[in-house]
């Protein structure tokens, strides 16, 4: 899978931009606040119809416009697929092969991506919500049915929580049980998919982490499932408690992950270097896992992370990704990038203007 071309209309600081990409490596070079990250954000938006930087869609639209559009050409094994995502006051529209996709579950996965940015350290040391979002994004790209179940679960959860906010005397437990059944139906599928995904991810990540640490450290990933027994029974047993709390207190929306090195919790006791190595191991593991599950390698987006890694980790990242994935890197300098291949494209970014260096 390769992204051959991208076109932006009123996206961030780009009113009208069209870029053709190298199938191997693309580097965006420039000082901070010039628009480098916006390119990677646009690729992320094209793939997932969402930004990784903001939840406020209005921030994505150029100040001079009322709507924006990101389109691209994705080269797959047997076809080149045009993709397009439009955003306006009326909402978003996603198209594949010029046809509107009514369900996001049918669109997401057309362009598979892996984003590695400084904030990815939050996967290890951040909030449980960050780790749940990580599972949802990666599983949504691999299995469309997971995204469908996740959306249905969140809809049912929102409805149940809204009902729990009613006056206690007005709550009908028979109706609440109906909502419980809807929640359990999709929640059980989500938990099964998450458990399977983490088990497979751990196999790849453990092997990579041992290589990165020369066998000195053993990585373990634990999926802390909030539901301990039968989801339906737990919902039923907690009805009175949930009515009192006005919220649903059990379910996959409260799941979490933990990471251990040699049986030590990395979030609590690991050094920053160890946390970085764990995050890197997970990202590298995802490359092979996504290929294993879908038959396609994802596109790798590296947003200003090379300067965060020492030469050893840089080399591991480049050697593991190149040859498998099309890679996009943003950086302020090439000084810290070692052993770059010759077949690449370098784009110079200055105040929203992008010039491609002659190859």
Swiss-Prot record:
One of its GO terms (biological process) is double-strand break repair. It is found in: Cytoplasm. ATP binds at residues 30-37. Its main location: cytoplasm. GO terms for molecular function: ATP binding; single-stranded DNA binding. Keywords: ATP-binding, Cytoplasm, DNA damage, DNA repair, DNA replication, DNA-binding, Nucleotide-binding, SOS response. NCBIfam families: recf (TIGR00611). Belongs to the RecF family. This is DNA replication and repair protein RecF. It comes from Lactococcus lactis subsp. cremoris (strain SK11). The lineage of its organism: Bacteria, Bacillati, Bacillota, Bacilli, Lactobacillales.
């Amino acid at each position: 899978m390769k992204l051959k071309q991208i076109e932006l209309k009123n996206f961030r600081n780009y009113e009208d931009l069209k870029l053709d990409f190298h199938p191997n490596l693309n580097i965006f070079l420039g000082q901070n606040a010039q628009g480098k990250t916006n390119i990677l954000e646009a690729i992320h938006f094209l793939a997932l119809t969402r930004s990784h930087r903001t939840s406020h869609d209005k921030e994505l639209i150029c100040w001079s416009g009322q709507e924006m559009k990101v389109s691209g050409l994705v080269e797959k094994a047997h076809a080149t697929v045009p993709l397009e995502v439009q955003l306006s006051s009326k909402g978003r529209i996603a198209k594949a092969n010029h046809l509107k996709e009514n369900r996001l579950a049918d669109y997401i996965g057309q362009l598979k991506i892996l984003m590695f940015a400084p904030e990815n350290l939050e996967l290890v040391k951040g909030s449980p919500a960050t780790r749940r979002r990580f599972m949802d994004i990666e599983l949504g790209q691999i299995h469309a049915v997971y995204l469908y179940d996740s959306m249905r679960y969140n809809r049912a959860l929102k409805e149940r929580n809204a009902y729990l906010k009613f006056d206690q005397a007005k709550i009908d437990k028979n109706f609440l049980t109906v909502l419980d059944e809807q929640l359990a139906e999709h929640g059980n599928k989500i938990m099964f998919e998450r458990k399977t995904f983490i088990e497979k991810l751990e196999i790849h990540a453990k092997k990579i982490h041992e290589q990165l640490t020369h066998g000195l450290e053993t990585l373990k990933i634990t999926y802390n499932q909030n539901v301990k027994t039968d989801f339906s029974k737990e919902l039923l047993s907690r009805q009175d408690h949930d009515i009192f709390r006005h919220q649903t207190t059990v379910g996959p929306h409260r799941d979490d992950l933990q990471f251990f090195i040699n049986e030590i919790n990395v979030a609590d006791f690991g050094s920053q270097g160890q946390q970085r190595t764990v995050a890197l191991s997970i990202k590298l593991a995802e490359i092979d896992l996504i290929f294993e599950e879908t038959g396609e390698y994802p596109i790798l987006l590296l947003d200003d992370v090379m300067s965060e890694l020492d030469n050893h980790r840089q080399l591991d990242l480049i050697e593991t990704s190149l040859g498998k994935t099309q890679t996009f890197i943003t950086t302020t300098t090439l000084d810290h990038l070692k052993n770059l291949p010759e077949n690449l494209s370098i784009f110079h970014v200055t105040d929203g203007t992008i010039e491609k260096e002659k190859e």
